[in-house]
Structure formats: structure tokens, C-alpha cells
């Protein structure tokens, strides 16, 4: 390859990176409530698809609640629910309240299993925090994750 071709290739790569950077920086800012609603919908869809990892994507490593002291224990429960076959998950439109780097979402969750057996039917309140994350896997950004939840009585299920 000629030296002039190498220079042109490098210039083209640099210009391409600049254009990509400008496009990423100019991406519209999504409101906090919409980010949380999108994550809740993605988790609901993941639940119906038996994708425990997809559900746990919204959960912080610092997660704990009245029943579980870590996301690992939560994963065990979700795996057990998923083993019982297909589930149908309906969720009321969540009410999201954001205060700085914390937020609360409240909605009603109804889960049915085989033969329309009710697996879960309660209101769920989730506590969210804004944590460090990455967009496109490399660009540092803040993401909303669940750190705690109140979801009624699990002992009946």
C-alpha cells in the first residue's frame, strides 16, 4: 500500500470516529421516568421469555429486600419460577417518582402460570438508584437500577 493511501485511510478513520462521537453526544436525553419505564417493560418481556438474566439487568449488585439479602438469592427464586413452565406477566402502568439520583416505581404485577394458575398478584414498589454504567458497552453513563423492592407476601406463593 502506498504511503499516501495509508495517510488517506487514517484520515478517513479519524473523520469517521469524529462523526460517530458527535452523533453519540447529540443523542437526545431520555427523561428519567421513561428510562425506568423502558427498563420495567424490558424486564417484564424477559420474564415471559424465561430470560432470568434479562430480568436481572435492572437489578443492582447492591440489591436487598425483606426476603433476599443479595441478587444471587433473587436469581434462585426467579430460576425456580421459570422452571414451572411458561408464565404470562401483566403489569399496570407504573407510577414513577424521581428525586435526584433516587426513584420509586409502583405498579401491580399479575403473573399466571400453566392453566391460568395465579402465581403472583400484588402491588410492587421498587426503589431505584442511578449507578455507573456503560452505553454501547464502552461509553460511561448513568443507569437506573433497582436496589430494593417491596412486593407483598411471597409466602403464599
Regions found by a protein language model. Give the residues of each.
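Non-catalytic, surface-exposed connector residues within folded enzymatic/regulatory domains
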Residues: 30, 67-68, 118
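Short beta-strand segments enriched in hydrophobic/aromatic residues
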Residues: 47, 59, 109-111
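Short, low-complexity N-terminal intrinsically disordered segments enriched in polar/charged residues
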Residues: 2-57
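Solvent-exposed loop/turn segments at secondary-structure junctions
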Residues: 63, 111-112, 153-156
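Surface-exposed, charged secondary-structure patches
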Residues: 76-123, 127
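Short, solvent-exposed secondary-structure junction/capping segments
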Residues: 56-72
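Short beta-strand edge/turn micro-motifs at domain boundaries
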Residues: 2-8, 118-157
Amino acid at each position: 500500500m502506498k504511503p499516501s493511501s495509508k495517510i488517506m485511510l487514517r484520515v478517513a478513520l479519524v473523520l469517521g470516529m469524529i462523526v460517530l462521537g458527535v452523533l453519540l453526544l447529540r443523542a437526545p436525553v431520555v427523561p428519567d421516568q421513561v428510562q425506568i419505564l423502558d427498563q420495567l417493560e424490558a424486564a417484564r418481556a424477559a420474564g415471559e421469555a424465561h430470560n432470568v438474566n434479562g430480568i436481572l439487568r435492572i437489578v443492582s449488585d447492591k440489591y436487598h429486600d425483606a426476603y433476599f439479602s443479595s441478587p444471587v438469592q433473587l436469581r434462585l427464586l426467579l430460576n425456580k419460577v421459570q422452571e414451572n413452565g411458561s408464565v404470562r406477566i401483566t403489569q399496570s402502568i407504573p407510577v414513577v417518582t424521581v428525586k435526584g439520583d433516587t426513584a420509586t416505581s409502583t405498579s401491580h404485577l399479575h403473573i399466571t402460570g400453566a392453566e391460568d394458575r395465579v402465581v403472583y398478584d400484588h402491588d410492587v414498589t421498587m426503589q431505584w438508584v442511578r449507578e455507573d454504567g456503560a452505553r454501547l458497552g464502552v461509553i460511561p453513563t448513568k443507569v437506573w437500577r433497582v436496589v430494593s423492592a417491596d412486593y407483598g407476601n411471597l409466602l403464599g406463593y
